[in-house]
Every structure is written in structure tokens, then in C-alpha cells.
From Swiss-Prot:
GO CC aspect terms: cytosolic large ribosomal subunit
InterPro entries found in the cross-reference section: Ribosomal_uL3, Ribosomal_uL3_bac/org-type, Ribosomal_uL3_CS, Transl_B-barrel_sf
Superkingdom of source: Bacteria
Originating species: Syntrophotalea carbinolica (strain DSM 2380 / NBRC 103641 / GraBd1) (Pelobacter carbinolicus)
SUPFAM superfamilies the UniProt entry points to: Translation proteins (SSF50447)
Keyword Cytoplasm: no
One Pfam assignment: Ribosomal_L3
Name used for this protein in its record: Large ribosomal subunit protein uL3
Assembly notes: Part of the 50S ribosomal subunit. Forms a cluster with proteins L14 and L19.
Alphabetic keyword roster: Ribonucleoprotein, Ribosomal protein, RNA-binding, rRNA-binding
């Protein structure tokens, strides 16, 4: 079985447990993914599957990529990712991997996605700096303050928290719980929030820390 599956974030809602508690959940369309290529330890040095997810118009695909897609016989795909696979011989090119059987209610998973881009932000929003006083004659409000010393070390240390691009980075949220699986619609309900915007690509894997 593969150690991961591709999905798409559809949004957030809430469900009610048997005891009446309200649980915030993220609805994720997990699969179906198609096996496009097999990577074996003998040929490539590791075992993995290349998965395709999300249909794409063939008119917008170049010939080399289309030749790669035709091997599966399932059309073109918008997203291609490699995932680890333990039993590589159990899968063939063209096989579909669905959320049915991959997830079960109560599973603990890790979700990887690209966080929402916030653009260029200052140190208060980006790094939670306290800032200065808002009144009483203060002229220091949202500035970063000192970033180094004068005589020594006479430089700014690497990694100093400063203003800059915020978000739009690969983020993994660990230890999330699967609340419900609805295989007829390829939907998985995950407790809490996951990285990225609506319709963002997600890689869902069984938790490494369980």
C-alpha cells in the first residue's frame, strides 16, 4: 500500500459527534489517484509510485507529457507527485488509488500543503513582535527595533527575524484525526484546519509519530 494519497481542500464545516459535541472539520476530496509510473529499488534505488490527480484538458499538454500520460490510459492530470510504497508489486500502471481502504475513522494523519500567501509583511504580523507604545509621545510603533550591535559583531546575524514574504510555503500539519470517510464521494473529513487555500493540493500520509 502507498504511504500517501493526493487530495484537494474543499473547505471547512462542522459535524456533531454522538455525544452532541460540535467538531470543526476540513472537507478534503482525497483521490481517486492514478498510478502513472513505478519506481523500483532495482532500477531507481527506491520504491515509490508516481500518482496523477485532477483531470486536465489534453489540449494544454505538450507531446512528451502526453506520451507519459498515455501509458496509464486514463487521460492527462494536473498534479503529479511521488509517494512512498512498501509493496510495489501490488500496483500496476493505470491502477486507481481511492480513499476507501486507505482511511478509517479515528486514523491519525499528516497533511502537507502550500500555505496561503500573505505578501510582504512587517515583523508584527510575520513574527508576532510586540511593537512599541501606541501613544504618550512614542515614535516607535510597528518597527523591528535594533537588528544588530555597533562595534561588535558589526553585522546582522543570519536568520534574524525581519519583514519579508509571508506564507506561500510548504507546510505540514501533524497529528490530525480522521473524523469520517465518505468513499462514495471520495471525501474525507479531517478534524481541525489543514494548510492552504480552498482547492489547494494536499498530500495526506499516515502519521509518522504514531
Amino acid at each position: 500500500m502507498t504511504k500517501g494519497i493526493l487530495g484537494k481542500k474543499l473547505g471547512m464545516t462542522q459535524v456533531f459527534a454522538v455525544d452532541g459535541k460540535c467538531i470543526p472539520v476540513t472537507v478534503v476530496e482525497a483521490g481517486p489517484c492514478v498510478v502513472l509510473q513505478k519506481k523500483t529499488e532495482e532500477k531507481d534505488g527506491y520504491n515509490a509510485l508516481q500518482l496523477g490527480f485532477g483531470a486536465k484538458k489534453t489540449q494544454s499538454v505538450n507531446k512528451p507529457a502526453m506520451g507519459h500520460f498515455k501509458k496509464s490510459g486514463k487521460g492527462a492530470f494536473e498534479f503529479l507527485r511521488e509517494v512512498e510504497c512498501e509493496n510495489i508489486d501490488d500496483h500496476a500502471v493505470g491502477d486507481e488509488i481511492t480513499c476507501d481502504g486507505f482511511f478509517a475513522t479515528g486514523d491519525v494523519i499528516d497533511v502537507t500543503g502550500t500555505s496561503k500567501g500573505k505578501g510582504f509583511q512587517g515583523v508584527i504580523k510575520r513574527w508576532n513582535f510586540a511593537g512599541g507604545r501606541a501613544s504618550h509621545g512614542s515614535m516607535f510603533h510597528r518597527r523591528p527595533g535594533g537588528i544588530g550591535a555597533s562595534a561588535w559583531p558589526s553585522r546582522v546575524f543570519k536568520g534574524k527575524k525581519m519583514a519579508g514574504q509571508m506564507g506561500n510555503k510548504r507546510v505540514t500539519t501533524q497529528g490530525l484525526e480522521v473524523v469520517d470517510v465518505r468513499p462514495e464521494k471520495s471525501l474525507v473529513l479531517i478534524k481541525g484546519a489543514v494548510p492552504g487555500p480552498v482547492n489547494g493540493l494536499l498530500l495526506i500520509r499516515k502519521s509518522r509519530k504514531v
